[in-house]
Amino acid sequence: TNPVGETNDYDAGRYAAVLTLLREKSRWAETPAGVHRGVSAYFCHNSYAAEVVDVVVKDNIPTVERVVAVVDCGIVVNKDAAINMAEGAIIDGIGNALYGELTFKDGVPQKNNFNSYKLIRMNEVPKDIEVHFVENEKDPTGMGEPPFPPVFAAVANALFKATGRRFYNQPFINEFAKKS
């Protein structure tokens, strides 16, 4: 039986093409010493996105140094805009994965402004973000959201490589500090 339902909306061949291009562009087989890699893939809005995240741990602080993303969103109408959307989604996702924390007391959010809610800072943004597209003649599909979700799992998988422990609770930086 199919574990995710009777039918799948996604095309396994397109997923495979994304992962094949990601393996090539990320130079997956050439992981540098001291770099911990995580990978994740996601399907939404009829688009396919996958990312490899390189994490380095210095002074017991994990830092995302590099992200390589591959997206299949059909025909890319405006490549510069699509790259910008992917980069923004990736940066926002890293910020949420590592630092984003919402706490509530009696149903009221305890962090209700930017002075108490940590956002990723420019010096915490990866120095290298590469975005690549699978070239095909498929109709254009969603571009803004698909690169956002996979970065969470890719960061968690890189942290697993660094520590041997799984990270399930965000923000991961808190979990990393507790377990290191």
Give the residues covered by each predicted segment:
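Cofactor-binding beta-sheet edge motifs in enzyme active sites
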Residues: 1-180
